[in-house]
Regions:
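N-terminal assembly/interaction segments in proteins that build large macromolecular machines
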Residues: 1-154
Length: 154
């Protein structure tokens, strides 16, 4: 069990709200939580929060984690994929596995924690966050975010 996994069930209620504005056209506000206000004041924690805000500005995720994807959205996309003509000739159980893989790929770009980390694409945002948990010795949770782009409505 890694350090990050051991700390994963600990309560993270402190932290900070980080904001980032890119070229006056894209704005991001993100809530990043940790266990103590001491860690929230550390430069490493502040840097993590800032880098996550930059990630959100650059990559436009819709959800923090897979758990945040609404069931209706998941079912809608799954139904579209299942209706694909290229899957019609495949056996049922093979179609299920193919669709599961396609679903994972479809949502990987929309889920912040699954995205390739922009400053080191050899790891995901989730892996980068786990490294910070191990380094800082506390559970860290990216709770929520809002991304606003000039001239673009939701």
């Amino acid at each position: 069990m890694t350090k990050a996994e051991k700390k994963g069930d600990r309560e993270a209620r402190e932290g900070l709200i980080e904001s980032y504005v890119h070229s006056g056209r894209i704005g991001v506000i993100v809530e990043v939580n940790c266990e103590t206000d001491f860690v929230a004041r550390l430069d490493d924690f502040k840097t993590l929060a800032h880098e996550v805000a930059m990630q959100i500005a650059a990559m436009s995720p819709k959800y923090v984690s897979e758990a945040d994807i609404p069931a209706e959205e998941m079912e809608r996309v799954k139904a579209e994929l299942m209706a694909s003509e290229s899957l019609a000739s495949k056996p049922e159980e093979m179609r299920e596995k193919i669709v599961e893989g396609q679903l994972k790929k479809h949502f990987a770009e929309q889920v912040l924690m699954s995205q390739a980390y922009i400053l080191d694409d050899s790891k995901t945002v989730e892996q980068h966050t786990k490294e910070a948990i191990a380094k800082l010795g506390e559970n860290i949770v990216i709770r929520q975010f809002k991304r606003i782009e000039l001239g673009v409505s939701e």
